[in-house]
């Protein structure tokens, strides 16, 4: 059974001006160092909090790579939750679960013309190796069983429901199109992601 290990106050966002709390956990199945970032004490004051399960993306979240929209989705969510409250479950699942070095190998294949899924498949991996059981364990540790899920990804919806979390509403993020990621985004849309390119 997972439990909260520590709860630390800090300022987040690109300008480090948004108050939040970062929670660590013990008892997670794989012992990966996943964290929750909580805004406006949403786990204590909201019966159905806004939640995003965000998989780590070093290239996008930290270095603002042109290859994906992960950093923009994260920042959009931080800004949204700074106003309405919510919880980001930051999951150590780099490269849809294949790891950083394998993701960089996949980038090389994408440079040769493959899309993100074809590249992963060429390396011997499935389209998406992530499992969200530990995300459910983190929510359970916070006594949360019903959420509003921020995602465009139907796999996340299905997986978290299968682990006993009720979804009251699905909230989509914007399609963050920029030079270098349009092919990537259209590949995701072709695999079922709900992306609105008109906004």
From Swiss-Prot:
Its cofactor is Zn(2+). The keyword Transcription regulation does not apply. Keywords: GTP-binding, Hydrolase, Metal-binding, Nucleotide-binding, Riboflavin biosynthesis, Zinc. Gene3D superfamilies: GTP cyclohydrolase II. Binds 1 zinc ion per subunit. Its EC number is 3.5.4.25. Transmembrane segments: none annotated. The keyword Zinc applies. It comes from the Bacteria. Pathway: Cofactor biosynthesis; riboflavin biosynthesis; 5-amino-6-(D-ribitylamino)uracil from GTP: step 1/4. It is an enzyme of class 3 (hydrolase). It holds the Pfam family GTP_cyclohydro2. One of its GO terms (cellular component) is cytosol. One of its GO terms (molecular function) is GTP binding. InterPro entries: GTP_cyclohydro_II, RibA, RibA-like_sf. GO terms for biological process: riboflavin biosynthetic process. It catalyses: GTP + 4 H2O = 2,5-diamino-6-hydroxy-4-(5-phosphoribosylamino)-pyrimidine + formate + 2 phosphate + 3 H(+). Catalyzes the conversion of GTP to 2,5-diamino-6-ribosylamino-4(3H)-pyrimidinone 5'-phosphate (DARP), formate and pyrophosphate. HAMAP family: RibA. This is GTP cyclohydrolase-2. It comes from Aliivibrio fischeri (strain MJ11).
């Amino acid at each position: 059974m997972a439990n909260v290990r520590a709860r630390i106050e800090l300022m987040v966002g690109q300008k480090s001006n948004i108050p939040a709390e970062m929670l660590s956990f013990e008892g997670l199945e794989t012992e990966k160092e996943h964290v929750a970032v909580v805004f406006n004490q949403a786990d204590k004051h909201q019966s159905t909090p806004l939640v995003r399960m965000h998989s780590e993306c070093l290239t996008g979240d930290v270095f603002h790579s042109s290859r994906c929209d992960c950093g923009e989705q994260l920042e959009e969510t931080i800004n949204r939750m700074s106003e309405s409250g919510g919880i980001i479950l930051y999951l150590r699942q780099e490269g849809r679960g294949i790891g950083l070095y394998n993701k960089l190998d996949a980038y090389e294949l994408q440079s040769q013309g493959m899309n993100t899924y074809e590249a992963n498949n060429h390396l011997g991996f499935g389209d998406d190796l992530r499992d969200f059981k530990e995300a459910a364990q983190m929510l359970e540790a916070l006594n949360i069983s019903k959420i509003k899920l921020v995602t465009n990804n139907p796999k996340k919806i299905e997986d978290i429901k299968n682990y006993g979390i009720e979804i009251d509403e699905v909230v989509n993020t914007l399609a963050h199109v920029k030079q270098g990621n349009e092919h990537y985004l259209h590949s995701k849309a072709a695999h079922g992601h709900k992306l609105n390119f008109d906004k």
